[in-house]
Swiss-Prot record:
NCBIfam families recorded: PRK03972.1 (NF003053)
GO biological process: rRNA processing
Domain of life of the source: Archaea
Name under which the protein is recorded: Probable Brix domain-containing ribosomal biogenesis protein
Record has Ribosomal protein as a keyword: no
Described function: Probably involved in the biogenesis of the ribosome.
UniProt keyword list: Ribosome biogenesis
Limits of the Brix domain: 2-191
Organism of provenance: Methanopyrus kandleri (strain AV19 / DSM 6324 / JCM 9639 / NBRC 100938)
InterPro entries: Brix, Brix_dom_Rbsml_bgen_prot
GO molecular function: rRNA binding
């Protein structure tokens, strides 16, 4: 996996900060870059100094996480590669009870019967993060055995949103879960 950094908008609310800390624990080799009063340019420079190649930038609206932007720092100038409009999040403490530090190799997969949109999201995330994408045909155990991984990021459907991104340790859902309503790449857009 490419090294990642995670940051927020300036003066984030507690829930947004908690989501960023959960993402730091869920993504192997990720670091949290404290934004404070710095502008985004200075934050990108600090992320580059820490060795990050990908930046997860979480913005908020009304005290809740609203958007997740994935910026590729390996390109000059850094470019926005993916953007998710969030409809809600479930933190690790809400799913599992406490914060869990996930370590090991990350693999991205989908639900058993994915729609084309979920495949596109999984492939795009896999490309940006530099991790393996394994289409799911059977159970989560089959994906883990095929990829020899410990951490799964599962892209699946949701009745009220376009989809969800959920982190698993082996076959146990530990979170965070991000419910997205809109997904954009540099070339296309998928909306609910």
């Amino acid at each position: 996996m490419r090294p990642a950094a995670i940051t927020t908008s300036q003066r984030p609310a507690r829930r947004t900060r908690s989501l960023c800390r959960d993402l730091e624990c869920a993504l192997p080799d990720a670091t949290y870059v404290l934004r404070g009063t710095k502008n985004l340019r200075d934050t990108v420079l600090e992320a580059l100094e820490s060795g990050a190649e990908v930046l997860f930038y979480v913005t908020e609206a009304k005290g809740n996480p609203a958007r997740l932007h994935v910026i590729d720092l390996g390109e000059i100038p850094p470019r926005l590669r993916l953007s998710f409009w969030l409809g809600g999040v479930k933190l690790q403490r809400e799913l599992f009870g406490n914060r869990v530090d996930l370590s090991g190799d990350l693999v991205i997969t989908t639900s058993k019967r994915p729609v084309s949109g979920h495949m596109k999201v999984a492939e795009s995330l896999s490309e940006v993060l530099g991790v393996e994408f394994v289409p799911r045909a059977g159970s989560l155990e089959d994906v883990l055995e095929e990829a020899l991984a410990d951490v799964l990021l599962v892209v699946e459907g949701h009745p009220r949103h376009l989809g969800t991104l959920t982190f698993y340790r082996r076959t146990e859902k530990v979170g965070p879960s991000l419910f997205y309503r809109d997904f954009r790449t540099k070339d296309e857009r998928m909306k609910l």
